[in-house]
C-alpha cells in the first residue's frame, strides 16, 4: 500500500501503520464531502481512532439527520470514484495562517496559535479540499476501499465544556470489504448484547431525561440482581474482617479541600451548594468520609489492619457523550473499601485484595482480563499531588509487592489516582473496548492530609498507610458487564425470576398456583404466568424476554401425577418430582452455581 509523507516522498506503508493511514485519509475525504454539502462548515480536529475516524465540525445552526449522514457517505463515495491525487505542501507560518483565513478555518487558526513554536505548517490537498495535517496519507482517494459513516454526537472544542459544542461525525474504515463486513457482524452482536437494550426488555432499569441524563433508576427486577451482588460481596468481605459502614452522599467543600479532591478532581464533581453560609458538594468518592471514620477514635497498632467497607452512592459529572446506561453514569454505587495498615502490612493486605479480586473473577467465570500498574505523569503537577519523594516511595512499594506476589502486570504512565499509584484490573467485555473493573490503590498522601495516626509498639505516633480498593468496581458497571456477558441469562442465584410457572390452560391454574406457593415457601423467586395465552407464547416470553433459568410447564398430566415438567434455557425438558426440583434449584442458589 503506497502512502505519501508531508515532504512529498512516496513509499510502501509499514504494515502496522496501514489502518491508521487509511482511517486518517477517510477523515479528510469525509471532511471534503461535508464541505461540498455544507459550505459553511468550519473544521476542528479529525483524527484516526482505534476502529475508524471522526471529524469535529462547526455547522452553525445546521442539525444533521440520519438521511444527512447517508448523503455525506454518498458524497464520500463520489470523491473516492473521482480518484483525486492527494498532495502535500508546506508553508511558512504567515502564509499558512493567511491560507486558513482565506478558507475561513477559524479552529485551525486557533490551533496554529497554540503551536507557537512552529515556524511552518504542512497541508494535504485533494481536489478543492485542503487540510492542515502532518500525514501520511494514501496517494489517491480511490485507494480508500471500505468505509462507513456510523453516527454523530456532540463534542466540545478542545474537550472543554466552556467552549462551543461541535458536531462529531464518526466513521469506520478498513483495508477491504471483508474486514468491514466482519466489523458489521461484530456490531450486530454488540447490539444484541447491549445492556441498555436487554435491561429495557427485562425491565431491569430505566432512565428518563426528566430525572436527568446519566441517572438510571433500578426497577424491581434489576434491584433484585443488584441486591444479590451486594449480598455476595459483603459476605466475602465480612469473612475477611471488613467492617461495613454507611456515610452521607454529600460533604462540605472543606472536606474535599482537605483531601485534595477540590484541587485535583473538581472538574469531575457537581457544583457546590450553598446552605446556611456553608458550601456542600455531592461526593465523587468515599475516601474522605472513611478517613473521618478512622479519625473518630485513637488507634493502636493492634487495631490494624482496619478494613472499612461500604456500598456507597457516588456522583460524578460525566460529559453527556460518555454516558452509557448503567455502565457509565453520573450516579453509581461503589463496592468501596479503605484498608488502614502499617507499612509492614502493605504486602499482606495487597495480597489479600488481589486474592479477593481473582477469587471473585473465578466465581463469575471472568477470564479475559489484564493487570495494569497505573503510575503518575511526573510532568503533570496539576493532576497529581506534588510530592516526588512520596510518589517514588509509593510506586516502588506497589511495584515490588506485585512482583513479589507473582502478578503479571504492565505499566501505564498518567493513569494513577491523584494521591497514589494503583493496580487496575481491566476486563475485556464480550463487546467493545476494555475497561477497569477492580482496583487497588496505595496511598501515603491522604492519611497525612487528615493527620491520621496510630500508636506503634514503641509508643510513638505514626501515620498509617491506606489501601483504596474496589472489587466489583461499581455494582452498576459490574451488572452491565454481566448482562452483556450472559445476554441477560443470569445464573439461577442471580436471576430476577428463577422459575416461571406456565399453566397450559385454565384447567391447571389451581395446580399451578399450589406449585407456585410451594416454591415461594422454599425461598425461590417465582412468577406465575396466568395470562390467557397459548403455551407456546408463554414459553417464548419466559425464554426470550424474561430469560428465566427454569420454566415449569404444567398440564393435565402433571396435575394428575403431582409432578412438574421442567424446561431449561436450552429447551431441554425433564419430568421431576416437586421436591426434587426444589432441591435442585435451592442447591444452585445456595452454592451460587454458574
Language-model features: locations:
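Conserved P-loop NTP-binding catalytic core
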Residues: 45
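NTP/phosphate- and nucleic-acid-binding module
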Residues: 1-42, 50, 56-594
Amino acid at each position: 500500500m503506497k502512502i505519501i509523507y508531508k515532504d512529498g516522498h512516496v513509499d510502501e506503508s509499514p504494515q502496522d501503520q496501514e489502518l491508521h493511514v487509511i482511517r486518517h485519509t477517510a477523515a479528510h475525504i469525509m471532511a471534503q464531502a461535508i464541505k461540498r454539502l455544507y459550505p459553511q462548515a468550519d473544521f476542528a480536529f479529525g483524527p484516526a481512532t482505534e476502529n475508524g475516524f471522526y471529524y469535529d465540525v462547526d455547522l452553525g445552526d445546521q442539525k444533521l439527520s440520519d438521511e444527512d449522514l447517508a448523503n455525506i457517505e454518498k458524497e464520500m463515495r463520489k470523491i473516492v470514484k473521482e480518484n483525486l491525487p492527494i498532495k502535500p505542501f508546506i508553508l511558512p507560518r504567515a502564509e499558512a495562517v493567511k491560507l486558513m483565513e482565506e478558507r475561513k478555518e477559524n479552529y485551525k487558526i486557533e490551533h496554529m496559535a497554540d503551536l507557537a513554536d512552529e515556524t511552518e505548517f504542512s497541508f494535504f490537498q485533494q481536489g478543492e479540499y485542503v487540510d492542515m495535517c502532518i500525514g501520511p496519507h494514501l496517494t489517491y482517494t480511490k485507494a480508500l476501499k471500505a468505509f462507513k459513516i456510523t453516527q454523530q454526537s456532540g463534542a466540545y472544542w478542545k474537550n472543554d465544556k466552556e467552549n462551543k459544542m461541535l458536531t462529531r461525525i464518526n466513521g469506520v474504515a478498513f483495508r477491504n470489504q471483508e474486514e468491514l463486513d466482519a466489523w458489521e457482524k461484530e456490531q450486530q452482536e454488540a447490539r444484541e448484547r447491549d445492556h441498555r437494550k436487554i435491561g429495557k426488555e427485562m425491565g431491569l432499569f430505566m432512565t428518563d431525561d426528566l430525572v436527568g441524563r446519566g441517572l438510571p433508576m433500578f426497577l424491581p427486577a434489576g434491584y433484585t440482581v443488584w441486591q444479590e451482588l451486594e449480598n455476595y460481596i459483603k459476605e466475602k468481605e465480612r469473612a475477611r474482617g471488613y467492617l461495613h459502614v454507611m456515610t452521607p452522599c454529600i460533604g462540605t467543600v472543606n472536606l474535599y479541600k482537605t483531601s485534595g479532591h477540590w484541587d485535583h478532581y473538581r472538574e469531575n464533581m457537581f457544583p457546590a451548594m450553598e446552605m446556611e453560609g456553608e458550601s456542600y458538594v455531592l461526593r465523587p468518592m468515599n475516601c474522605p468520609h472513611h478517613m473521618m471514620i478512622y479519625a473518630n477514635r485513637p488507634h493502636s497498632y493492634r487495631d490494624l489492619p482496619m478494613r472499612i467497607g461500604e456500598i456507597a452512592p457516588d456522583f460524578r459529572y460525566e460529559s453527556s457523550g460518555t454516558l452509557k446506561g448503567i455502565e457509565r453514569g453520573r450516579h453509581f454505587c461503589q463496592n468501596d473499601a479503605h484498608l488502614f495498615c502499617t507499612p509492614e502490612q502493605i504486602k499482606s493486605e495487597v495480597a489479600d485484595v488481589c486474592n479477593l479480586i481473582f477469587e471473585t473473577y473465578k466465581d463469575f467465570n471472568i477470564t479475559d482480563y489484564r493487570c495494569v500498574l497505573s503510575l503518575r505523569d511526573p510532568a503533570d503537577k496539576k493532576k497529581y499531588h506534588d510530592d516526588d519523594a512520596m510518589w517514588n516511595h509509593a510506586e516502588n512499594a506497589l511495584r515490588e509487592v506485585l512482583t513479589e506476589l507473582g502478578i503479571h502486570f504492565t505499566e501505564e504512565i498518567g493513569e494513577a489516582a491523584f494521591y497514589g499509584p494503583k493496580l487496575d484490573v481491566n476486563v475485556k467485555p464480550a463487546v467493545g473496548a476494555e475497561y477497569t473493573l477492580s482496583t487497588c490503590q496505595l496511598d501515603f498522601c491522604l492519611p497525612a492530609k487528615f493527620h491520621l495516626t496510630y500508636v506503634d509498639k514503641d509508643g510513638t505516633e505514626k501515620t498509617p498507610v491506606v489501601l483504596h480498593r474496589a472489587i466489583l468496581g461499581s455494582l452498576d458497571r459490574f451488572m452491565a458487564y454481566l448482562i452483556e456477558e450472559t445476554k441477560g441469562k443470569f445464573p439461577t442465584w442471580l436471576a430476577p425470576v428463577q422459575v416461571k410457572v406456565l399453566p397450559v390452560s385454565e384447567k391447571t391454574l389451581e395446580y399451578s398456583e399450589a406449585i407456585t406457593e410451594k416454591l415461594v415457601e422454599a425461598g425461590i423467586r417465582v412468577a406465575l404466568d396466568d395470562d390467557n395465552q397459548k403455551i407456546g407464547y408463554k414459553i417464548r416470553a419466559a425464554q426470550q424476554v424474561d430469560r428465566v433459568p427454569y420454566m415449569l410447564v404444567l398440564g393435565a398430566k402433571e396435575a394428575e401425577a403431582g409432578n412438574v415438567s421442567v424446561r431449561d434455557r436450552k429447551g431441554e425438558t425433564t419430568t421431576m418430582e416437586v421436591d426434587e426440583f426444589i432441591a435442585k434449584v435451592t442447591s444452585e442458589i445456595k452454592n451460587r452455581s454458574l
